[in-house]
């Protein structure tokens, strides 16, 4: 399978998508001071086996989720609810693990690696094209709030810019663990792209003193089966603001729609909502490209209906329908549409 994917230039390695060895979890997991070294050892083992064939690598996927939801709200495994101070210690260890993983890949891979990571993109986008709204959206996109970890700059400033974000210092204050100069040097290994998972955003307008004011969604605003608001603009402004901040090419590592899909009497799966969703989002991404954002690529989530960590098999994200009783796979209408989009290299969307 790997050789076939490599031959088709469709191979990118996601090194960590949340499954964590129980033995290491029992020793403290991401709270343990040696957890970055454990991850570097794992990276070395994988790179020794696959580094001659895989060129593109992501170190960690959605760290806001596996820490914030796994150890903050407890919605995801391992289902713990820890104080923010302890979660922030985990953040630092995750950032160290990322940096050590990047260094390991560059040292071990036989093929020159192209490396990034893939945090969640927290996007606030301007309600109108007014400069005040754009400024407010940019500021909100980079902001941090003290009660949770779902933001951009707490995570990415140390690994890209080699500093603790000013927004994080203001929000968390004394709750932040110490970041030594040596820590920041380890974290801020050169990356080749900034991966980001974007599904939705929040519209804002400029309020008093430039403060961002969220704009309520109109009644009946389109929502996914996951109850996420459909906001195509987020795929324009998110990459734009993140590129302004970090200066790296952007890779959309996840974007897609959870929909209510089933096999119709004609044996097909008709999902016009997914086609419309993807078309609208890709059009906005094209606007970002036209405005100078170097977009390296786009991954649709997902190829197959899949298992979601907290939702199980309730949410169907796939371009291919999976019958979970028989495991029969049925390409949806969106599968054929997206295939043609790829063949046309995005022309005509």
Model-predicted regions and their roles:
Residues 14, 46, 57, 98, ...:
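Conserved, mostly hydrophobic/aromatic
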Residues 92, 99-104, 117-180, 201-202, ...:
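Glycan-recognition surfaces
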């Amino acid at each position: 399978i790997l050789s076939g994917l490599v031959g088709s230039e469709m191979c990118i390695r996601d090194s960590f998508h949340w499954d964590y060895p129980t033995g290491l979890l029992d020793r403290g997991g991401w709270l343990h001071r040696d957890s970055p070294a454990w991850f570097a050892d794992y990276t070395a083992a994988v790179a020794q086996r696959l580094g001659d064939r895989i060129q593109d690598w992501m170190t960690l996927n959605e760290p806001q989720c596996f820490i914030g939801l796994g150890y903050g709200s407890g919605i995801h495994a391992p289902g713990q609810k820890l104080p923010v101070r302890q979660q922030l210690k985990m953040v630092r260890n995750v950032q160290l693990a990322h940096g050590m993983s990047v260094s390991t890949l560059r040292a071990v891979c036989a093929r020159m690696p192209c490396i990034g990571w893939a945090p969640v993109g927290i996007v606030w986008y301007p309600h109108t094209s007014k400069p005040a709204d754009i400024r407010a959206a940019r500021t909100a996109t980079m902001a941090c709030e003290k009660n949770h970890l779902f933001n951009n700059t707490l995570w990415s400033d140390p690994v890209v810019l080699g500093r603790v974000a000013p927004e994080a210092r203001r929000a968390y204050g004394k709750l932040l663990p110490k970041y030594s100069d040596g820590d920041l040097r380890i974290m801020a290994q050169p990356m080749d792209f900034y991966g980001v998972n974007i599904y939705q955003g929040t519209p804002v307008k400029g309020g008093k003193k430039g403060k961002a004011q969220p704009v309520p969604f109109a009644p009946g605003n389109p929502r996914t089966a996951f109850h996420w608001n459909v906001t195509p603009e987020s795929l324009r402004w998110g990459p734009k603001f993140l590129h302004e901040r970090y200066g790296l090419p952007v890779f959309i590592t996840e974007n897609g729609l959870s929909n209510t899909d089933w096999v119709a009497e004609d044996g097909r799966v008709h999902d016009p909502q997914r086609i419309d969703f993807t078309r609208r989002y890709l059009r906005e991404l094209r606007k970002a490209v036209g405005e100078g954002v170097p977009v390296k690529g786009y991954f649709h989530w997902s190829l197959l209906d899949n298992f979601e960590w907290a939702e199980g098999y309730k949410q169907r994200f796939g371009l291919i329908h999976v019958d979970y009783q028989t495991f029969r796979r049925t390409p949806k209408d969106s599968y054929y549409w997206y295939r043609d989009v790829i063949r046309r290299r995005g022309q005509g969307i």
